[in-house]
């Protein structure tokens, strides 16, 4: 697929991400791929473009290696913060690992009635929670959703962790629903005994009772079920795959697309980064060899993903850091790069 112009043929999709800007119903956009392929640069640039056509945009990093702060040259944390130079684009960085202890320890401590409250279940419930595979990602993502739900953003862009973690991350609604259903089932069977034990030990923290906790857990389950439904709605959610033209990256991309399809999550855009476009008389043998290899995998991408919007991005001479360079990079996501020479 040529990146020198937007192709008008109805049988060929445009090599841009303009379709994401035009789809006004989108609320959740995930950007992911193998490590080191330019996910953060792509997600930041896409968020910048979205901010030009949407009222409010939130960019969230769920990658423990948080690069949003480095990309924009501005410190971000667990709370959403406006990005310098924008009045409708905010960012936040949340580590999806290791927050379950904090959630359980803080549940109900301040007496609020939010959906994540009431998780001071004692050692027995903590052991049960930790025994459920994937519950750490699930609980952490629920914390993200709690913060997101308390704010008002028209579209949310996720800069995700490398492929394997992201795929587990996207399973969280199912995992959490199963976990909460299991806890509810156990409470039905052992509720009286638990109440007796808890009563003998002075009850739960904050003076809560088991019924209140179960009620909050059911409320949380309903919230997760709603988000799960939205994630599987192609009008509201899509996943942008980022890769480079190499075997391992293409393999990871194909595996990710297969997994996303099995989760019923829409994906129809691929960004291929770090492409070489050597000049016609370039004498660099390494450049020529690498370009030859890249062309091979670009042809495979063209054959495999003919029904995808495939964006081809050049290898740049400088790092894409700071607002000005991100703005320039983002323009190439909607206006295809035109190399001086292309063999």
From Swiss-Prot:
Keyword list, A-Z: ATP-binding, Cytoplasm, Endoplasmic reticulum, Hydrolase, Metal-binding, Nucleotide-binding, Transport, Zinc
Domain of life: Eukaryota
Cellular location(s): Cytoplasm; Endoplasmic reticulum
Gene Ontology BP, a term: pheromone-dependent signal transduction involved in conjugation with cellular fusion
UniProt xrefs under InterPro entries: Anion-transp_ATPase-like_dom (IPR025723), ATPase_ArsA/GET3 (IPR016300), ATPase_ArsA/GET3_euk (IPR027542), P-loop_NTPase (IPR027417)
Any one GO MF annotation of this record: ATP binding
Residues engaged in binding ATP: 34-41, 246, 273
Disulphide-bonded residues: none
Subunit relationships: Homodimer.
Family: Belongs to the arsA ATPase family.
Protein name according to UniProt: ATPase GET3
């Amino acid at each position: 697929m040529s990146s020198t112009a937007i192709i008008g043929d109805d049988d060929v999709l445009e090599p841009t991400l303009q379709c994401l800007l035009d789809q006004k119903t989108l609320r959740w956009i995930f950007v992911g791929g193998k490590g080191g392929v330019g996910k953060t640069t792509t997600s930041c640039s896409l968020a910048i473009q979205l901010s030009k056509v949407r009222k409010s945009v939130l960019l969230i990093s769920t990658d423990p290696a948080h690069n949003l702060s480095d990309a924009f040259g501005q410190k971000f944390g667990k709370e959403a913060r406006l990005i310098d130079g924008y009045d409708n684009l905010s960012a936040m960085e949340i580590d999806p690992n290791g927050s379950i202890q904090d959630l359980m320890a803080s549940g109900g401590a301040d007496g609020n009635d939010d959906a994540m409250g009431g998780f001071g279940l004692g050692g027995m419930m903590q052991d049960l929670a930790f025994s459920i595979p994937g519950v750490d990602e699930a609980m952490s993502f629920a914390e993200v959703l709690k913060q997101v739900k308390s704010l008002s953003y028209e579209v949310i862009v996720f800069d995700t962790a490398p492929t394997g973690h992201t795929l587990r991350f996207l399973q969280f609604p199912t995992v959490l629903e199963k976990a909460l259903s299991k806890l509810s089932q156990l409470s039905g069977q052992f509720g009286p005994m638990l109440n007796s034990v808890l009563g003998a030990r002075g009850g739960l923290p904050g003076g809560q009772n088991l019924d209140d906790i179960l009620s909050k857990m059911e409320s949380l389950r309903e919230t997760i079920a709603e988000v799960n439904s939205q994630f599987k709605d192609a009008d509201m959610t899509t996943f942008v795959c980022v890769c480079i033209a190499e075997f391992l990256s293409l393999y990871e991309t194909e595996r990710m697309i297969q997994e996303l399809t099995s989760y019923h999550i829409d994906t129809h855009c691929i960004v291929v980064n770090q492409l070489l476009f050597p000049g016609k008389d370039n004498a660099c043998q390494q450049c020529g060899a690498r370009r030859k290899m890249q062309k091979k995998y670009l042809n495979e991408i063209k054959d495999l993903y003919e029904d995808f919007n495939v964006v081809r991005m050049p290898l740049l001479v400088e790092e894409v850091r700071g607002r000005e360079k991100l703005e320039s990079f983002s323009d190439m996501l909607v206006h295809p790069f035109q190399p001086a020479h292309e063999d």
